[in-house]
Amino acid sequence: MTTEKRQILVTAALPYANGPIHLGHMVEHIQADIWVRFQRLKGNDCLFICGEDAHGTAIMITAQKQGLPPEALVAKMHKEHARDLGGFLIEYDNFYTTHSPENRELAELIYTRLKDKGDIFAKTISQAYDPVKEIFLPDRFIRGTCPRCGAKDQYGDVCEVCGATYSPTELIDPVSALSGAKPIEKNSEHFFFSLNRYTQLLKKWIDAGHLQPQVANKLKEWFSEDLKPWDISRDAPYFGFEIPHAANKYFYVWLDAPIGYMASLKNLSKQRPSVNFDAYWKEGSQTELYHFVGKDIVYFHALFWPAMLSGAGFRLPTTIYVHGYLTVNGQKMSKSRGTFITAHHYLDHLSPEYLRYYYAAKLSAQVEDIDLNLDDFIQRVNADLIGKYVNLASRCAGFITKNFGGKLANELPEPDLYESFLQTEQTITDYYESLNYSKAVRVIMSLADRANQYIDAKKPWALAKEINQEAQVQAVCTQGLNLFKILTTYLKPILPVTAKKVEQFLNCDELNFANLKTPLLDHSVNPFEPLMQRLLPETAAQLTHE
């Protein structure tokens, strides 16, 4: 019986074009990429898109400091971000930008539809203004004490401690991040989206299981009070899209940023005629849509975004997967401690697959922070990847190449052992599907232990010295390499480059779940070449030194 292919669209949150990608960002991109590669390995059609988050005052001010037009800064950061994501083997079908004609068109379309429904209204508000820089201050350029929990040094729109969102005027003891001056209040007409009109729709959507339970419970707390209208406009000077028929007013970056997911697919559909934009975004679509985001942007993705989509006549996400933050050696990343590690700096020193594996070994379906402990990182890479996984192949390959001209035996000596490895497929695929990568890794490494125990028990190195044991040596090593083939298939979403090397070594078709069950018998393999290098402490130490 053939199962129908799933049609899936996956997005990761757009990196902001204001600075380099760091290892904290990579948690999400790696988590999403592993899931996408797993889906493709299962034979599903899975598109993976992202792009540059290109708008906002922060971009404008950074560009001014660098003596660049904002467009030039965005183009530069887009190139750097694409390089770093590619370096970590993140395989997007399209890595686009929100500063695009497609995004402008879609943002205007959604805004117009919401306005025509009566969901947009104008209101004069009192707004923070920097009297020194003579500019209305965006939320992120005001720092102060959170009005909800009292945490100090928080942004003007969202508290990183308790997750509350608020208006900058509610912040306690605010100061301008640009000049240090105390902001003054200045009136300005802004446009608002009536989020409260979508309260019942959002409650129903959240109750329907589209979010992890932790996230759903957190969102339900915000319904204890009426949902407030959302300010979707900003005053000039601003880098972004002008609001139609509203002079000197621009869409707030958080309005057009998630629309960037749609724009990236729209752009991809122009490159690839087989990609049908409406199939993924039209109301009532039977395709699947998954957003991977950090816990700091849940409010925007799980309340504003579904409400906007619904109001504008588009489909809602199937699931929003939320992850926690990254700490390094148990603490928040810090430039002064040398633990603010950029993706580019990491790639200058270490293999991306080491970090892909380490993150996978830590990630679960829970919204938990994960810690990059450098000592544990070294130990995991060397013990698991080198000591268990790669070691299995290197123990067997030499005998096959040297003694048998690269030819595997024509049958498995222990078919039951092989079958027992196959029987874990459902468990492992369930763990991948549910984002419980750490559990999948534990099962895979326990299989690697069993495979190595088999080789330890059979001792092909001793058999090779005995008379008339050639067939037994060939059989044992054939068994070992076929178990290694299964392990490689299971690890392929995490270690795509290594898997490709293994396919070349085994001289076989691309490994996937469809051909998992078929052992390589009476088959010629190529000479074995080292798949990975042991991670030395002095090499890993370079991560925390510029």
Swiss-Prot record:
What is the gene name? metG
Residues where Zn(2+) binds: C146, C149, C159, C162
What's the top EC group for this one? ligase
Q: What is the lineage of its organism?
A: Bacteria, Pseudomonadati, Pseudomonadota, Gammaproteobacteria, Legionellales
Q: How does it assemble?
A: Monomer.
Provide the protein name: Methionine--tRNA ligase
UniProt cross-references to Gene3D superfamilies, sorted A to Z: HUPs, Isoleucyl-tRNA Synthetase, Domain 1, Methionyl-tRNA synthetase, Zn-domain
* Record-linked InterPro entries: aa-tRNA-synth_I_CS (IPR001412), Anticodon_Met (IPR041872), Met-tRNA_ligase_1 (IPR023458), Met-tRNA_synth (IPR014758), Methionyl/Leucyl_tRNA_Synth (IPR015413), MetRS_core (IPR033911), MetRS_Zn (IPR029038), Rossmann-like_a/b/a_fold (IPR014729)
Q: Bound how, and how many: what does the cofactor note say?
A: Binds 1 zinc ion per subunit.
Q: Which domain of life is it from?
A: Bacteria
- Answer yes or no on keyword Aminoacyl-tRNA synthetase: yes
Q: Report which reactions are catalysed by this protein.
A: tRNA(Met) + L-methionine + ATP = L-methionyl-tRNA(Met) + AMP + diphosphate
User: One GO cellular component from the entry?
Assistant: cytosol
